[in-house]
Structures are given as C-alpha cells and as structure tokens.
Amino acid sequence: MKIALDPTPFHHTHKLLEFPAVAAELGFKYLQMTPHPDLIPFFNHPKADDNLVKKMKQACKDSGVEIASVLPVLRWSGPDEDAREAAIRYWKRAIQITVDLGVKTMNTEFSGRPERAEESERAFYRSMEELLPIIEREGLDVLIDPHPDDFVEDGLQAIRTIRGVNSKNIGLVYVASHTFHMNQPPLTIMREAGEMLRLVHVSDTMDHKRSHGLRYITNPPGNSVRVHQHLKIGDGDVNWPEFFGGLKEIGFLDNPNSVMCSSVFAENEKNKETAKYQLAKIQEMIG
C-alpha cells in the first residue's frame, strides 16, 4: 500500500514544483496531485504544458518521491451538455498528463447534481462511453468518490453505479470525511466494494446527524447544504478501528497498488506538524 500526502495545505506556502521536496521532508514517499491552478484546476482545462509536466516528473525524481494518483475534478456528469462536453476534453488532457507523469491511478468525483440525479447519471454513462476506451488503452485505474452534494452520495449506490460501467479499470474511493453522508457504516461499504475499493482518504469529521441534527445549524432551516470537515485523525467521530479493520479485512492494506492518502484541510497554519502527525498515526493504526 502507498501512503500519500495531499499537498493542498501547502498551496499557500509552496509552489507546485516544491511539493515533492515537501513530501520527502515530512517522511512521505508518495504524493497525490489534487487540483492546482498550475496543473489541473477545478472544473477547467488543465494548465500544465509538456514542459511543466517534465519538470514535475524531474522534481519527483530529485526528491525520491512518486506520484501515487492524480485527482481531477471536472463536470463529466454535469447535466448541462456544454459543460459535460468540455469536461470530456479536459479529461483527455488530464489523462495524457497522468500518463506522461508515469502514474497509473486517477481518482475523482461523480461531479453531477443531486437535484438532477437522473440527468446526471445519463451524463455520467455517456461520458464513460467516450472515455473508457482511452482509460483501458492506457491501463489506468480511475476511482470515484461519492462526494457530498453529488448525484450519488450513498456508498452502496456508488458501488452499483460504478459496477454499471462494467470495467475493472473503474473503482471506488472511500473518503473517511464523507462517512456520515454515505448512509452505511464503513465496514458495510468496504465489504460490498471488495477489490473495487483501491484508494482511501484519511481525515476525520464530525457526525452532522448527532444531537438531533443540531450539531451544525445553517439558515434558513431545512436548506440543502451539506457539511463535513477534513480534520486530523481523532478530532472527529469516524470509527477508526472499524475503518482500518475493514481495510485489513478486504486486503486493501496488503495490495501494493492501493493508495491511502492523508487529506487534512482544516489546519493549514500547522500544515507540517499535522502531516507528520497523520503519517505517524496511519502507520500506528495499520500496524
């Protein structure tokens, strides 16, 4: 299993090409490349040219760090057809960047809309018809997270939707911080997913359903807002023994190609301290 750092907490203190050295300094051997304005920004066309990709690859080599996964967030399930078609073009470039970096894993979100779930599902499968031949040709794993405020938020429904693509190259991401939006305990989802689950994000969150749903109060009452955090392990309500125990049970921890990414976003002012804590805690909990 690869333990990776999400460098998002370092976006305000370091440049893109400095991320590999930061990861190495903190004891990580792997990076996950999440959306960044100089590489693949949220929802828009990738901004890295071939020269920048080569520089990024060299920076990793110089630091002894590998990129475990590349994470684009693009509207490939968007119910707006113009946005969906654009996302397909962006995805093709993101795939080429990933291949040129020598990376075999991409992870992402469904990126549709919950209030237009049926149209979003149609858009998702339409996009997969065009992208899947490229994904399979390049030998990539593309793993998908049922993110809060998406057309698929339920963990078991995410598995069904991915299964419908009918490709071993498409799998599941489990983000611990999304646990309380997925409607089933981690172990239930992990057991159902089995080998489909090949990437997890490790960060804690509060259970927004506790205290009669009044742990968080948003106004006006009854609005459709989703709330979660990306806290360090132990600062929220995630059942970590169940989480790590489930991963061990399904063989995730013994898979050399699976990725476990530390993704704490709530403590940028203590980014290095938090990253070191996360790595030590992960190593402790996997034994």
State each model region's role.
Residues L17, K54, Q58-E66, W76-L172, ...:
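Active-site acidic/histidine proton-transfer and metal-coordination neighborhood
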Residues F10, V259-T274:
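A short, acidic, flexible beta-alpha connecting loop/helix-capping segment that sits on the rim
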Residues Q32, S69-L71, N107, L143, ...:
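Conserved beta-strand positions in the central sheet of alpha/beta enzyme cores
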Residues L17-P37, G102:
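Catalytic domains of carbohydrate-active enzymes, especially glycoside hydrolases
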Residues Q32-K57, F110-R116:
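Glycine-rich, proline-tolerant flexible connector loops at the mouths of alpha/beta enzymes
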Residues K2-T8, L31, P37, R126-D237, ...:
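Acidic/histidine-rich catalytic cores of soluble enzymes
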Residues N271-G287:
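C-terminal helical cap(s) of enzyme catalytic domains, especially alpha/beta-barrels
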Residues H12-A23, E85-Q96, M182-M190:
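Short, acidic/polar
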